């Protein structure tokens, strides 16, 4: 067993960013085994405007971790600081949330070299990765044709109209 602290609340980027939580590690690690933090993947809103205040649940990039809560370096420092004190960090990931860079379905390809391993990590996306019953399938272009001809399997979970429903059966 153990005790987990929710290290954020809605729109708490200033009060609970990575630097603030790192500075509180001496105190918090005395009482908590885990600190729960929001998704750290870079949202498209932050990519376009670094003053964006996204909570991170609209990630566009999964392999880049700069957000309104801080930079990837600040995140790594926070994790290392708590780990050294025996406290873990757990990230709140909504695996079915994926946002496009500038529209519904333009998911950028990602290519990142691991800092510790030197290994290349790559992600690429297509319309086949989006469930065929996602609401984007109902969007029409100016000629009345399906704007996003998505071809993934039917959604296996709850539908959420805010972001694309990803086909996890094709992984």
Question: Residues of each region from the PLM?
Answer:
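Substrate-binding/active-site clefts of carbohydrate-active enzymes
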Residues: 3-26, 30-171
